[in-house]
Swiss-Prot record:
Gene Ontology terms, MF aspect: [protein-PII] uridylyltransferase activity; phosphoric diester hydrolase activity
Cited function: Modifies, by uridylylation and deuridylylation, the PII regulatory proteins (GlnB and homologs), in response to the nitrogen status of the cell that GlnD senses through the glutamine level. Under low glutamine levels, catalyzes the conversion of the PII proteins and UTP to PII-UMP and PPi, while under higher glutamine levels, GlnD hydrolyzes PII-UMP to PII and UMP (deuridylylation). Thus, controls uridylylation state and activity of the PII proteins, and plays an important role in the regulation of nitrogen assimilation and metabolism.
ACT domain location: 701-782, 809-879
Region (Uridylyl-removing): 341-700
HAMAP family: PII_uridylyl_transf
Every HD domain range: 458-580
Control of this protein's activity: Uridylyltransferase (UTase) activity is inhibited by glutamine, while glutamine activates uridylyl-removing (UR) activity.
Superkingdom per UniProt: Bacteria
Name of the encoding gene: glnD
Protein family per UniProt: Belongs to the GlnD family.
Reaction equations catalysed: [protein-PII]-L-tyrosine + UTP = [protein-PII]-uridylyl-L-tyrosine + diphosphate; [protein-PII]-uridylyl-L-tyrosine + H2O = [protein-PII]-L-tyrosine + UMP + H(+)
Protein name: Bifunctional uridylyltransferase/uridylyl-removing enzyme
GO biological process, one term: regulation of nitrogen utilization
Amino acid sequence: MANVQEDKDFHGRWPDRTLQPCLKDYKALLESYQNWSAARFVTADIDELVHHRATFFDQLISQLWQQFQLEDEPASILAVGGYGRETLHPGSDIDLLILVGPENAEAEAKLSEKLGQFVTFLWDLHLDIGHSVRTIEDCFAQSENDITIATNLIESRYLSGAESLYNEFHQQLLNDFPWSSRDFYQAKLDEQKQRHQQYHSTSYNLEPNIKSSPGGLRDIQTVGWIAKRHFRTHSDENLVEYGYMTADEFVELRDCMNWLWRIRFALHLEAGKREDRLLFDFQPGVAVRLGYGNDGKASVETMMKDYFKVVLRVSELNQMLLQFFHQAILGTQDLQHAEHISDDFAVANKLLTARHDNVFDNHCNIIRAFVCIAEHPQIQGIHSNTIRLLRNARAQLSEPLSHDPECRDLFNQLIQHPRGCGLSFALMHHHSVLASYLSQWQQIVGQMQFDLFHAYTVDEHTFRLVRNLYRFSDEDYQDQFPLCEKLVAQMDRRYCLYLAGIFHDIAKGRGGDHSELGEMDARNFCHQHGYSEEDAELVAWLVRHHLTMSVTAQKRDIHDPEVIQDFANQVSTPERLDYLYCLTVADIRATNQSLWNNWKATLLEELYNATSYLLQQDSNKPTLDIRQKINENKASAMALLLSAGFEKAEILALWGRFTADYFFRHTAEQISWHSQHILNLPSEQLPLILIGDENNYGTTELFIYHHEEGHLFASVAGVLDSQQLNILDAQILATRDGFVMDTFVVLQRDGKPLTEPHRIEEVKQQLLDVLHKRIPVPSTKRPLSRRMKNFSVATEVTFIPSKHHGRTTFELVTLDRPGLIAKLAAILQQQNVILLAAKITTIGEQAEDLFIVTTEQQTALSDKQKKTLKAKIIKDLEF
């Protein structure tokens, strides 16, 4: 054990070990060491820092053990956990195992008192101590059924006390460890799988846990634990000698560990405590400490790109080495009975395996391997020996594989194979072969965006998009997306869809419009790979316009014929519409886990159907037949109402009060629902409030029928916000005789519809109380969430040109926050602006909302009114 007092750098004043321990002196020592350690972080090697810290605490604990007169007691103190590995970070737990021998009652009481004083002193120093007091027998008995205790025993390290007791323990650890290699391996593998599931089995979390996320420090430790148990060694270096890993793999794993150690050390310093979650709060400060600069978002994105690249390497090494251990060391591989599928490859135990070690000397075999996987559906993965060869070959490449004509032919073969974008594409992504093939893909590996919208790096998002496209034709995912499945089944150029998916975000992070830059990349790729001009045009168009359908469906009024007409003009052909619809669905579903819902699905499908109807007309300039849709809705609603027992005359009398816009914007089921309740309602019982799911969108529909009194929206928005309901869509329609029919589509904060009867009644009652002015509109002032506080979005108001003379449309972009819509409604009310419709879209931390408004005279806003409204919104919404 090194003597920290003699360290040439740390000159802290150590308390005299011959005196009684003084809390004040030790606190001063700890403060001095913490300051020295933080200062050293800037220039010191991280390996030196974490080991130096462990050595420092070795001496501190050993000295206190002596000062509390425990040296001559039948007890010894051991470091376990990370401390047992001789590594400590500023906020790490200091895990201790105190071994005691069997003693008589009097001696045991005396020892217990001393140990209590010792541990209490450590706590009084505010150290994060984790400790247990056990006999040798207890240690092994408890470890039999607890893999965590068993792992701690493997990593135990002697600090001080009765050496004979420790030697007895260590001998039993070597000879009578209760877990066999096979059982220990399986238990640690199960433990890792469960841990990964807590993080959705992906390394690409916005706020990753440096220690426990997939690809984190725990994955490196798992590799070491399994090998150390099997080979009965404490040294990582010995694992190369035992043939568990190559020297290069050992160096790579150590480099990755040091990088993760450095970011964890910085995180602990930034947080001022143990914190392994790289939260948004800490990311800018950690980036500064690691030397990425103080450029805020840009510095964070660069740091996180490096982080994601490291954890990708760790994940690959972890899986390869654990598979190798299972196959080669536990003896489960059976290459003798492999099925030869080519001169270079075979299938053994459902894994692709190389038939000779120089298989990848021909670098085209890198791509050919994945073609083999597509051609042989029995293959479920790649053998660890072959992964090792692949990794070595990948490292030897001097240029992208796409520069080789034979590789290009093989890649085309793969993309056009019915199973090519399934398992093969997934494995190419996981083993960084896509980055070896396309130089543009290399640039997006680990590329993240510092926001709450994009849950994955660009490469991971793109992989998930392509996987979604593939699943539209995969029998295992049948009936999940019927329209997409139908359209993909009819496509004779499905490979164009996959290529568009690969290139849709390929230019992110370069600056400029990524859609335009990606379009050029896609076109060049198609020309380089020998695709026809027709194919190149389709792929390039899809990449250029991959956001168009999503923006139109979510941020425009798709019940406005002008909007549908403009979108149809952009798309121009039914074929483009089919491809774009499938690409859009796959894209949204691959962005984050909570983005896709029935509401978005319905918006996209409605836009698809309306546009498809237009594009299938024979006219060169197709138009939407509004009158036909109105008549169809009326006829269907009439049939529903007649079957419910209403008279045709009373139905027509009611409908005579409604405008044509009402029948165009609502389904027959909605019209029937509204009409039934209005016809049954005594006039003195206004307002009529209906809450249900008649829209079948997986959302809740709120319908209010009331006397027209202006700015009803502001009151309703305040109530809905106080009830923790998000407005997705609002339609404000007036009857011909002074009534309003307001329809709101809402979801609860957790994204679920409102279904509980008591909640529905609560919302309805509060609305009645507010509309009857029995209570004021609830306040919408609530603090921002922890996550939202780390983001800023400049408020922008953009007026959108429209041919409608009686209305004005504007888009609002601002930071999403509690009560935003209610606040905007209040601003409109103050400015005497009447809301006609609203479309609410939340993009992570950013609100991108569309509002259609008019004046009290039912005219469009003048330029002066627009200027005043814009200034008021920006002033009131800015922080």
